Amino acid sequence: MLCGPLCRFLWLWPYLSYVEAVPIRKVQDDTKTLIKTIVTRINDISHTQSVSSKQRVAGLDFIPGLHPVLSLSKMDQTLAIYQQILTGLPSRNVVQISNDLENLRDLLHLLASSKNCPLPRARGLETLESLGGALEASLYSTEVVALSRLQASLQDMLWRLDLSPGC
């Protein structure tokens, strides 16, 4: 009688260990799909095509550009900054993108936990509140530059996810 639950557990063990590996691949695929979806949403906003992601715009240096090395924690930190910037904009174009960034950050946390990476919840810019006046004066420029740089960062993240980034 004591062997009953133990025997069932041992019988199910190969299936349970196999099922463990499948979701991580699915999470990685879902992450890539969501990145592609966000890039498509940005492409659908017509005015984002007018600025290069590499172009320097005075006063908007707080918007992150491309990083040479993107670990999972750096990806999360970058997305947190973009999410904070987008939620500060009044445009309805960016609401869904901001929500997608939150979901993307959750997927990155799942990927990190699968690699036993302690990935603390990244915070956005602490100085963004002090830039309130500058943001209000240039909302359109901020939106265009932020979306353009976000798109370039997402495409870089997509490429780096294939290389299995570190913690």
Swiss-Prot record:
One MF term in the entry's GO annotations: DNA binding
Covalent S-S links between cysteines: C117-C167
Signal peptide bounds: 1-21
Localization per record: Secreted
Transmembrane segments: none
Record's GO cellular component terms: cytoplasm; extracellular space
InterPro entries reported in the protein's UniProt record: 4_helix_cytokine-like_core (IPR009079), Leptin (IPR000065)
Keywords (A to Z) from UniProt: Disulfide bond, Obesity, Secreted, Signal
Gene3D superfamilies: 1.20.1250.10
GO biological process, one term: prostaglandin secretion
Major site of localization recorded for this protein: secreted
Protein role: Key player in the regulation of energy balance and body weight control. Once released into the circulation, has central and peripheral effects by binding LEPR, found in many tissues, which results in the activation of several major signaling pathways. In the hypothalamus, acts as an appetite-regulating factor that induces a decrease in food intake and an increase in energy consumption by inducing anorexinogenic factors and suppressing orexigenic neuropeptides, also regulates bone mass and secretion of hypothalamo-pituitary-adrenal hormones.
Protein name as it appears in the record: Leptin
Encoding gene, per UniProt annotation: LEP
